[in-house]
């Protein structure tokens, strides 16, 4: 009995001295394992006389119960200590300032499109829209582009697979036709047709990619049709827009004679970089001209009574000029390090 009491006390002391569960399991094995001290006591019961066996067995069971109780108590203490340590490590300092939500921002090209729309709305234009998947008729035929024109080639235009009459629009000009047809139909009973004055922002697609071109890019089409609309009106509108867009009177702008099948006469508009490595270079930002009589006819407008001008400008390139960016592709790579500068 004395030996069993000492064994229990020794086990309790060993359990109390361990610092983790692995050490506790090792201590348990020394007393309750297959070769443990208490197990050896149980094995020795068979050698005792029958009259002593019952009393010795009861004493060993009491000792085993005491050791198991000490083991479980220490196991619970270690679990609680581990939990407290984890809570302390993961504790939140409620006195620290909270993390504010990081604000997003518009894409720089979206900013430019909004600015263009705002400036043209201020002089009486409205915003129109149309499909990006267009018919060959709206994209080419109705815009006075003959069947053998190079722009119709698959090297320049994305056609839908299996269809040679459906394509991704190469410009926003098809919306001119849709707008004129709808406008003429709406005012068919009027003695005089009200003016058409619209801008058409949207994505367009061409087979092209370099520092100043992208296979997908944005374009803003402008159309003004009415009685006695002239090229002087076109130059005045464009010059006024550019001065307001760049917020300066000191702007290098030039109109170059050009050719487009849907306008006559036609011109291209160039603006010079004002800073950066490309300073002094001229960059084309728009094509423009007086709407060709054939295009007016396709739109249902009488070219003998009405004239109009149209322009198509690249807001992507205007964004390059406004922010001093030299590679158009940077706008579409999705690099937040670049885009976050424009918030």
From Swiss-Prot:
Top-level enzyme category: ligase
Catalyzed reactions: tRNA(Phe) + L-phenylalanine + ATP = L-phenylalanyl-tRNA(Phe) + AMP + diphosphate + H(+)
Keywords noted in UniProt: Aminoacyl-tRNA synthetase, ATP-binding, Cytoplasm, Ligase, Magnesium, Metal-binding, Nucleotide-binding, Protein biosynthesis
Gene Ontology molecular function, alphabetical: ATP binding; magnesium ion binding; phenylalanine-tRNA ligase activity; tRNA binding
Subcellular location: Cytoplasm
GO cellular component: cytoplasm
Biological process according to GO: phenylalanyl-tRNA aminoacylation
Pfam families linked: Phe_tRNA-synt_N, tRNA-synt_2d
Co-factor: note: Binds 2 magnesium ions per tetramer.
Family label: Belongs to the class-II aminoacyl-tRNA synthetase family. Phe-tRNA synthetase alpha subunit type 1 subfamily.
NCBIfam families: pheS (TIGR00468)
Protein's name in the database: Phenylalanine--tRNA ligase alpha subunit
Taxonomic classification: Bacteria, Pseudomonadati, Pseudomonadota, Betaproteobacteria, Rhodocyclales
Gene: pheS
